[in-house]
A protein has these predicted regions:
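Extracytoplasmic
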Residues: 12-46, 235-240, 364
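Residue-level signature of mid-helix packing/kink "hotspots" within the transmembrane helices
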Residues: 29, 57-65, 116, 150-151, ...
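Extracytoplasmic gate region of multi-pass secondary transporters
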Residues: 31-32, 215-271, 330-331, 361-365
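Conserved MFS/SLC helix-loop-helix module at the cytosolic interface between two early adjacent transmembrane helices
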Residues: 62-102
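Structural signature of the two symmetry-related core transmembrane helices
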Residues: 78-93, 286-305
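Cytoplasmic helix-loop-helix junction between adjacent transmembrane helices
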Residues: 107-146
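Glycine-rich segments within core transmembrane alpha-helices of 12-TM secondary carriers
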Residues: 136-158, 263-268, 353-365
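Helix-loop-helix hairpin linking two adjacent transmembrane segments in secondary transporters
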Residues: 142-188
Length: 407
């Protein structure tokens, strides 16, 4: 069958990668929603729920650097196909393994491992295929697609049986693999000339692992990413449970968990266009990255601080939605900063950053369960802790970030 050619090469890459991120993000949202009815069936304790939710992050943590390495050695196309196929299989078989807590946790680890390969591979692809003047938009569309995936899953899953959620979204991944084969531009890495004119050519120099670890500008990015993910993981993992158990939500109310992701996707696209617009108005890249990161970390911190004292469910959803929306500004902030400071190694720096930023995903499950249990079912310490982490991340990024090439 003839390959599809009705989009430009860059557009096809962005569209395909965004579709992969849609499925990636949708699959990871299913369990936080499904765990509410599953707990009624399997009678899991709050701590057991915490470990089920955090098991994903254990796998995700281990595969970040591997994703970047394999993409450079084996080809981004091959790595991305394999990762989507593996995480789709893990999603599809989850209902069959749910009767065994151990088997379910292992399946969640495999899911996390496969999904962890995705974004570093995509960053590797973007770093070699997207011109500088289009990067903010490309990253914004990429991350917005993840929010759309989370939105779709959050809307549909409360109205499906818990096992059907896994079957449907697992099947989407199988469809994507076929689309990738027919739409992917084969010439994406065919020659050095495919690297955009406005992107630095690969520099032949010796890079040590210490260069990725000892750079203050890179640590500014790593810390900002960690801070962003701390609050994001709490919301992703625990918002359905919080609305259902603490604010008295029902199946209809759980559909409201889609609203934060809708707002996040809209803000993500808007922030990308705003950032590119500021660059066209001669703002420095550094000032744009700092502005977007400050809005993306300080804004959510303030709204989470208010969210934790509200007991009116619709108002609580409004507050957490604004928080998630402002968080999307990070896509044009520190997340885009990788290709500014390390254009030839953006896949590797993102892999390291995402590995560090996965630690909150490992901790948020058991730590949240322990805090809620210790404070007699109160969640205030959970959200105030996230507020503090966000504010510290914003301060460290603002005072240490650069936009010049360091690697």
């Amino acid at each position: 069958m003839a390959r599809i050619r009705w989009l430009t090469r860059t557009s096809r890459i962005v569209a395909l990668c965004s579709a992969a991120n849609f499925i990636n993000s949708a699959d990871r949202v299913i369990m936080p929603i499904a765990i509410v009815p599953m707990t009624d069936i399997f009678q899991w304790s709050l701590h057991a729920q915490g470990w089920i939710l955090s098991a994903f992050a254990f796998g995700y943590f281990t595969s970040q650097i591997l994703g970047s390495f394999w993409a450079s050695k084996l080809g981004a196309k091959n790595v991305l196909i394999c990762s989507v196929l593996l995480w789709s299989i893990a999603t599809f078989v989850t209902p069959f393994l749910a009767h065994s807590l151990t088997a379910l946790v292992i399946c969640r680890i495999v899911l996390g491992f496969a999904e962890g390969l995705g974004l570093p591979t995509i960053f590797h692809l973007f770093a070699h295929s997207i011109p500088v003047e289009e990067r903010s938009r490309a990253f914004s569309y990429l991350l917005a697609s993840g929010s759309v995936g989370q939105t779709v899953a959050s809307v549909l899953c409360p109205h499906l049986t818990w096992d059907a959620c896994f079957y449907w979204f697992g099947s989407f991944g199988f469809i994507w693999v076929s689309l990738w084969y027919f739409v992917y531009p084969e010439d994406a890495f065919s020659s050095e000339d495919t690297i955009p004119l406005h992107m630095p050519k690969v520099i032949s120099r010796s890079i040590r692992w210490a260069d990725f670890i000892l750079s203050k500008p890179l640590w500014a990015i790593y810390v900002a990413h960690f801070a962003m993910n701390w609050s994001s993981y709490i919301i992703m993992q625990w918002l359905p449970t919080y609305l259902a158990r603490y604010l008295g939500g029902n199946a209809h109310s759980l559909s409201l968990t889609s609203v934060p992701y809708i707002v996040n996707s809209i803000f993500g696209v808007i922030s990308g266009h705003v950032a590119d617009g500021l660059l066209l108005k001669n703002w420095s890249v550094l000032n744009v990255r700092r502005l977007m990161t400050s809005v993306g970390l300080v804004g959510p911190a303030l709204f989470l601080a208010i969210f934790c004292v509200v007991d009116h469910l619709p108002f609580a959803v409004v507050l957490v939605s604004i928080s998630m929306g402002l968080s999307a500004c990070n896509s044009a902030g520190h997340l885009s900063n990788h290709v500014d400071v390390a254009p030839n190694y953006a896949g590797t720096t993102f892999a390291i950053s995402n590995t560090i930023a996965t630690i909150p995903g490992i901790l948020c499950g058991p730590v949240t369960a322990s805090l809620v249990t210790a404070f007699d079912g109160k969640w205030m310490t959970v959200f105030l802790g996230a507020t503090f982490v966000n504010l510290m991340g914003a301060f460290i990024y603002f005072t240490n970030s650069v936009a010049t090439q360091v690697l």
